[in-house]
Amino acid sequence: MSAAGTIKKLGVIGDVHAEHHRLEAALAFLQTMETDAIVCTGDIVDGIGCPNESIKLLDNAAIFTVRGNHDRWILEDKARHIENAHNVTELSEESLSYLTSLPTQVTLNTIRGKLLLCHGVADDDLRKVWPGTDRMGIERSHLLDKIILEGEFQYLINGHMHFRTLIHFEALTLINAGTLRGEHWPGFSVIDFEAENITAFEFRDNQIKRVKTHDLVQEAHTIWADTQSFCGGWDPVTLF
């Protein structure tokens, strides 16, 4: 799926997990930031809040949203044993229609090049990408390597890992959107493509707080050729 228009400023919302109150607050805040568009990495269901309200908010605001693995699972009646899982019977007809119609990928045009929005990597909603740290081993992706090699996209925004970070490749910047869920750095971000930076916001004590701003491209960051060049010992560029 492709979307027309050239984006200068983009709102970025990660995995929702039915946090409809935080989603509503994030959308209202992003409206004040005068973003050209807002994206969401999916996983709308399975959480402590209301999936129908979450879906309605995304739909009414015309947010570019992709399907996450939890959205797929509820439609396939899989993994319903997980904590705070929803049942398909809890979804309205409108919500079912919305989830069924979600794409796995969305292409957007920015003033700095093309951007791919997905949940994991492209159509693989379970794929993780991680250069390797003391707490988590290396996660490589031949599919992402193919995307990098083809050179069509300059940016990729994904979710799934619930860990807002930047991973820099020579020809592409990967931005993990994080999540609205839980108490470990729940939040969202704003990318300013004119200024070439990203600003992170968090929910703290029921308020939205600005956390930090990072340059999208910076020589001090570790820059990889592709995921096969991951070698561990990475110092993550965090957005929290």
Predicted segment positions?
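Conserved beta-strand scaffold positions in the cores of enzyme catalytic domains, especially
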Residues: 65, 156, 174-176
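Short amphipathic alpha-helical segments
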Residues: 24-25, 51-53, 79, 129-130, ...
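Acidic, His/Gly-rich catalytic cores of divalent-metal-dependent hydrolytic chemistry
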Residues: 5, 165-240
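Active-site-proximal beta-strand elements of phosphoester/diester hydrolases
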Residues: 8-17, 114-123, 173-178
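His/acidic metal-ligating clusters that form di-metal
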Residues: 31-34, 94-171
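Structural motif
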Residues: 62, 114, 195-197
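Core catalytic region of metal-dependent phosphoesterases/phosphodiesterases
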Residues: 2, 6-101
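Active-site environment of divalent metal-dependent phosphoester hydrolases
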Residues: 17-22, 46-49, 70-76, 123-125, ...
